[in-house]
Curated annotation (Swiss-Prot):
Family: Belongs to the complex I subunit 2 family.
Catalytic reactions of this protein: a plastoquinone + NADH + (n+1) H(+)(in) = a plastoquinol + NAD(+) + n H(+)(out); a plastoquinone + NADPH + (n+1) H(+)(in) = a plastoquinol + NADP(+) + n H(+)(out)
Lineage, top ranks: Bacteria, Bacillati, Cyanobacteriota, Cyanophyceae, Synechococcales
GO biological process, one term: ATP synthesis coupled electron transport
Pfam name, any one: Proton_antipo_M
Bilayer disposition of the protein: Multi-pass membrane protein
Protein role: NDH-1 shuttles electrons from an unknown electron donor, via FMN and iron-sulfur (Fe-S) centers, to quinones in the respiratory and/or the photosynthetic chain. The immediate electron acceptor for the enzyme in this species is believed to be plastoquinone. Couples the redox reaction to proton translocation, and thus conserves the redox energy in a proton gradient. Cyanobacterial NDH-1 also plays a role in inorganic carbon-concentration.
Name under which the protein is recorded: NAD(P)H-quinone oxidoreductase subunit 2
EC number: 7.1.1.-
Name of encoding gene: ndhB
Residues annotated as signal peptide: none
Keywords, ordered alphabetically: Membrane, NAD, NADP, Plastoquinone, Quinone, Thylakoid, Translocase, Transmembrane, Transmembrane helix, Transport
Enzyme class: translocase
Amino acid sequence: MPNEIFTINLNAQAIIPEAFILLGIVGTLLVDLAGEKTASKWAPSICYLSIGSSLLSLTLQWNNPVESAFLGSFNSDNLAIAFRAIIALSTLVSLLISWRYTEQSGSPIGEFAAIVLSATLGAMLLCGSTDLISVFISLETLSVASYLLSGYLKRDPRSSEAALKYLLVGSAAAAVYLYGSSFLYGLSGSTNLTTIGLEIINKPSFITSLALVFVLSTVAFKIAAVPFHQWTPDVYEGSPTPVVAFLSVGSKTAGFAFAIRILSTTFSSFDEEWKLLFTILAILSMALGNVVALAQTSMKRMLAYSSIGQAGFVMIGIVSGTQDGLSAAVLYLAAYLFMNLGAFSCVILFSLRTGSDRILDYSGLYQKDPLITLGLSLCLLSLGGLPPMLGFFGKIYLFFAGWANHQYLLVIVGLVTSVISIYYYISVIKMMVVKEPQEASEIVKSYPEVNWGIAGLPPLRVALYTCVAVTALGGILSNPLFKLANTAVSETPFLQDVIAAANNIS
């Protein structure tokens, strides 16, 4: 037995990107112990080095995947690499836009960075987890760090309320996942997702269907799909804005990665059932998310409901289940990273200078801060799907893939709700560019002079310029990005097996 233990090949190189993130966590905690002044100086550099090294190692793994690691509990295939890269990039941008906000709020920077990196670690591990136990550990690592981040402004009652709500709903979602997992283990005698899928093929039963519903409920909570979205607006409104920016992209991306993996492996024999449930979730998310966003007066609440609608669009690609559909879903999540975090960069800048989050307070902003106005306008137009922005091409790929797979209802609902979303996005833009000075809000009239030299603002500026540039140059970037997304799907064996099986049935 001891000899067998030493001959086990764990293929630990699969998690080298996560190892760099872990080193970053240790580094930020150590500088935090040295005092706030030392942490403020060194924590950002440690984070950049950690995330940069992680992204570099992911690049080196691309097309050289480690298919099975840690006795089959983790796969570093191309799909996992793509999702982990999106999460790492979202963390990098979220940190760039958070330094000034964290410093101004009087919160410890080293501690904040360590928790953000911990959430990133959990999210990245979730993307490649192929075992019920590793999924749960990754899920809880992400969730616990997210609860801490939501309540990070300890002296703000809204932040504490957001953390408590998130904790209660998240704990319920974790319990539901464990209950569903216990059914799957009882039916198959295994915790490996692929093995479970093979064992339950010939065991269609009420218990299996119940397990599917429970697991799908956890997925829906993670991606904030209706009707599991109730936590989203309150948590987004009460949490620190940089935290909201990270959760809206990083957490959602991890949720979709988990959804694709478990639905395509464990529940591949229940293809019609989960696609029907996902279709219902997508329609409800697109409709409710975009309609309720019309009535919002808070910018963060509006973006919260917008993110619910955006999740519905991504689900179109997953429901189609084709090569183009899954590639379009990956592409849209990459596009969503830049256009959503670009919008949040502008919201954070406005909040830092005015302390306000009300949409009405943006009236006349063009006269005092043309940069925020231009950046926010471009990102909102991209979220609405207007050409020639990156979001337009992302939606086009999704709608074409859905239509080709005969998902006509989903595509029609997607088109209608996209038009609805354009209305509330353009309403914000119209408000910012009012012509008459007297129409400007009182907040804008007393708007401070723009000074980019303040500590913490140069990184935010870099993030803003980068996100807006990528969003605006969508026409040039969409094709190479789609090719990368297509490679992520075509070079992932379990997805090719599922796509081939679906083609044979059709």
